């Protein structure tokens, strides 16, 4: 992450690995300290270009940095008992109200698309770039009995 024109925070996220949200929050705090007046942060650019995705929970946590509340993603599985699972904003991150731009491209997939979609659908961010990969799906690991 770095500053552009002294007042715009630029964050490049290459994957949604463990602690991605924590690292983004830390970088934003550091950048705000570099800006003479914290209130003068004019905007944040979140670069998700060529980000293939990663951990769903990190995608939810990253979205939660910027969202006040609401649904980040809902999933539908094969089990009729669990047709829809909603991952709602988690607490612990103070949302930022600075204007937000998210950059994506054709190699932005999975968790990147979930974050970009959540931020766009809530009106929180403007999405710029080219069409994303189009995966927009979630995989989970299921234990199979030895029998």
Show which residues each predicted segment covers.
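Cleft-lining beta-strand/loop regions that shape enzyme active-site pockets
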Residues: 1-145
